Amino acid sequence: MFKPDWNALKAACAKKGYAFFERGRLNLNLIGIRHSDYASNGFDDVLCCAYMDPDGTKRVEHWPATTDPGWHWLKDEFMNAKGCAVLMPGQYRGAFAEGLHKGKYPCLVQVKPLKVWRDRNRDRTLDHASIDEGMFGIHIHKAGEASVQVDRWSAGCQVLARKADFLRMMELYDASARLYGPRVTYTLLTERDFG
C-alpha cells in the first residue's frame, strides 16, 4: 500500500493548488489516493488522514480503500444509462458530512455537488470526455470486516476495506467536527501526483 508522509501529501496538494490544513489540532486532511490500475476490483487505493494531534505532532494514518466502483456496478445494465459514476480527482471543499449509509449506519455522505466521469459502454475504461456534476449519493463508508474484493461494496463511493479503519476515520471526523463544524473537505489524488 502506498503510504505518503505528511510532507509528500502537503507537496502533492500544493502542486495542484489545493488547501492543506495545518492550523489547529485535529483539522483533518481527508485524502484518497487512486492507484494507477483502475480496473483491478481490489482495495488497491488508499485513504489517509493527515492532522495535528492535540500536542502538535503531525500524524498521518493510511487505510486500504477503493476510490473506484466494483466490477458488479461497472457492468450493471440497470445502473444509470450514462454508466456508473466515478469520482474525478479534485478537492471537494466541505462536500461531506455525517449521515447514514443506506439508512443503516453513520458514514460521511455527499452534501455538495461533485464531479464524476462515466463508463458509458461498461468496458471498465473511463470515458474522460464527459463530465457530470451533481448529487450522486457518493459516500465514504466501509466494506466488511476485512474485504479483499470491491464487487458490490462500491457503486462510486469511496470505501474503506476494513471496518476497524472506518471506525477510526469516523472517530477522527467526530473529534474534528466538534472543533470545526460538520462539513469536511475530501481531496482525491492519484499516485501520479506524487511523482
What is the predicted role of each segment?
Residues 160-163:
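Soluble non-cytosolic domains of exported or imported proteins
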Residues 1-151, 165-174, 180-184, 189-195:
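Cell wall/extracellular polymer interaction/catalysis modules
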